[in-house]
Amino acid sequence: FTAVQLPSPTRVIAAGTELAQRGELATHLVISTQRVVLGFSIGAVLGLVLGALIGLWGPARIAAAPTIGALRAVPSLAWVPLLLLWIGIGENSKVTLVAIGAFFPVYTTVSAALAHVDPKLVEAARAFGYRGVKLFTTVPLPAVLPSVVSGLRLALAQAGLFLVAAELLGASMGLGYLLTDSQNNGRTDRLLLAIVLLAVLGKLTDALI
């Protein structure tokens, strides 16, 4: 590889310093972080609610689970044209795409975990007079909590992947945009910087869960 194709760490650091001095680096980081946090929050809440509904209620599982399972297989970039037509090229479409990415891991883990809670434990709790919310927090919730945490961590990683897909198309700021702009201008140093920052951002957000 030439120095242009594979710049030294010194050049990558220099590129980051240059962007930081111009105020662009902080802007890219803040915007991408906002999109990940907002999209992840929306997707995770929807995944928890729908996953709990389908995991606990048999008719909902029979009616909706196959369709949701099929939608889960759709690649991230396939959603982009539809979201652009429905929502436009603004911020909402990017956050929505990130939310889609975060939704499926949470939904899948929660619904599967609740569906496999031992019915004997539930019946035993009912025999002791537990009903409604008290029953849910006593038996199913503790049983699925490890799966929920795993689902949230997977969702956060998936949100990062969908963030890049969202920012590669129709964005003027963010780490995904920095990737595309660096490629178009032959700035491999900035491109590698963006990759490193995405890795650091992913690691930091993963440490929160």
Predicted regions and their residues:
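Hydrophobic alpha-helical elements at and bordering transmembrane segments
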Residues: 25-29, 33, 63-71, 110, ...
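Transmembrane alpha-helices
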Residues: 96, 100, 132-166, 189, ...
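Hydrophobic alpha-helical transmembrane segments of polytopic membrane proteins
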Residues: 175-209
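Cytoplasmic-entry segments and transmembrane alpha-helices of multi-pass inner-membrane transporters
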Residues: 49-85, 98, 108-115, 122-123
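Periplasmic/extracellular loop-to-transmembrane helix junction in inner-membrane transport proteins
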Residues: 1-42
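Hydrophobic alpha-helical transmembrane segments of multipass integral membrane proteins
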Residues: 26, 30, 34-54, 197, ...
